[in-house]
Structure formats: C-alpha cells, structure tokens
Amino acid sequence: MNNVMNRLPVPTWNRCGVNSAPAGAALPAVPAEGFGPAPAAESILPAGFARLDAGFVAFTESGIGAEADAWLVENANSVCHLAVSEGVEINEPAVLSAELDAAHPNALTYVTVDAAKNSRLTLVQVVRGGAEHGVSANLTRIRAAEGAVVKLVQVQLLDGNARRWNAVAIETGTGAKVEQVRIELGAGTAVCGARAVLDKNRGEYDLDAVYFGAGDDLLDFNDVSVHTGHDTLCEMHTAGVLSGRADKILRGTIDFRRGAVHGVGHESEDVLLFSPTVRNRTAPLILCGEEQVEGQHAASVGRLDEDKLYYLRSRGLTEAQARRLMVDARFAPSIEKIPVESLRDEVRQDVARRLDHESLD
C-alpha cells in the first residue's frame, strides 16, 4: 500500500525528508488469502467494562492518517469495542495482549473505547513475539466524554523480524483527560502516530513515549495535539535510544486553532545515541492560530559522556552497566506508569537484553 502516512501537518523543506513517512514504512500488501486468523489473544476485562457489537460510526483520524485508519479497519482480524458507563470508576486495568508466532504471524487489531461522563479506566495493550515478515498493526480510537479519565498503555516487545504499525485517535469532552504511555522496543519497522482533538474546554492529553532502535531499524513517529477548546493542555514527552544504523523520525505537532484561548502545550524529546552511524531526525512544530496560548518544544541529543562513563567505571561499573544506568534514567518515568507490575519487570528485562546485545555487537 503506497498511501502517505505520518504526514507533517504543515510541510517543511523536502530535503529534510520529514514531511511524511518514507517508502519503507508503507503498510504491507494484503495477501491473496488475507492475513489469516489472529494469534491467540489474552483479554482481561475487570467488572465495569462492557463489550459492544460495533464501534464509532465517524471519528477523527489518527496520527498515521485517515487512509491508513480505513485500511486497518477493513483488514483487522481482531476487533474489540469497549464501553464504560457514566460515573463508573474502574481501578483494575483491562489488558489486551497478543503474541505473534510462525503459525499466526499477523495481528491486525481494531479497538475502540467509549468512556462515558465522569468515568475512569485504564487499558493496557501488549504485543510480543515475532515471525518472519510478521505484521502487528493496531488502530485504537478513544472517546472520553465530559470529566472522563482514560489511561492507555501500549507496550511493544516484538522481535526484530516483525513490522509494527500503531495508530491512535482521541476525542476529548469538556474537562476530560486522556493519558497515553507508548513503549516501542522492538520490530525492524515501527510506525506510530497519535492524534488528539481537544475541541472541548479544559480537555487534556498527555503522552509519555520511549523507543529503542538498533541494527537497521526504521522508526517513524507522528504525534499531533489539536486545540480548539479554551484552557486545554497537552504534554508530549519522548525518550529514545538509537544504536547501529537505526533511522528515526519524530514529528511532534501542537496545533493551537482559533478559539484555543489559554491553551498550553509542551513537547520534548531526549535521545541517546550509541553509534555514529545512526540517523536521527526530529521535527517539532507549533502552529498558532490564537494569540493567548503557551507552546514550548525542546529536543536533546547526546552521546555517552566520556567523563560520566569514566566516573561510573571508577565506581566499579562496567561499560555495559553504565549504559544500562543511563538508559534506565531516561526510560524510568514512562515505565513506572505501566500499571501491571509483571509487565513493568518484563519491559525492564527486555531493555536490558537489548542493551546487552548491542554491547556484544
């Protein structure tokens, strides 16, 4: 499929190569026999969640784009529509997980969440495993009504031979809040795009994301927060590690449109480079169609500081242990937001394994 994905809302100089995802990030062609059945999935739905027969009729596009959204809906081999009634607060997280393998190499999921007025819920999505040319493609749509609080945690622990697409679309009501935690640690190709529409007053969107790119990995991200209601707030913060010949593009857009009086938006990225052959590109963008707004963006790129490394080694740490310490410091704020302890431990172990593998290389 050759559709344009992860399009920057306002294009910049073409030579920068950040206006949209590269050709290597394109969605896969649909096999003649289809993608086959989904892998065996584990679903944990605490009391208070209801399964619906159908999702939303119309919805805002994700960060990846409307064409990709339509493709994901059409080709999904696993569909889950969830709803929580007005005033219901659910303390235990719902967990949806899948594991790719040779027999079931493709997981294409379509998930919708309808959080009614003053409800509260947490949804955890996990994908693991891998298969040659395996595909993990996910579209999640969240509607948070007035006063609702929704937390979405997405953890990707795929092998390097799999490919990953993760699209998120969010609509918030008055005083609603959606928090997204996105952890992308594997897959040879990882394409993610989140788009939140804060068109009601006092809506809030928070994104905490981490990524790990190694070898010849291709990582492409596009996160957008659209503000039209007044007193809206978004916080988008990303931390990443790149090694080998990994190629990464991150687009972060805060779009203040007319009517977004007293809107506030902050975005930042902190990248640690372990190799001189990586390619790291970041395109922070703040669009202002309203005067009384506050927007800030920051990007930090660093390598292993030789002085810090010497200090840590003088305290008895090996270089591999020092690397792990520096990565842990960057990833910990996001990992700590995973509400399932066993999954937090699994993520930490996966990060350590990937770092050890890089140090051996």
Regions found by a protein language model. Give the residues of each.
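Solvent-exposed edge beta-strands and adjacent loop segments
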Residues: 44-57
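Conserved beta-strand/loop scaffold segments within soluble protein domains that form the structured core
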Residues: 59-317, 331, 338-361
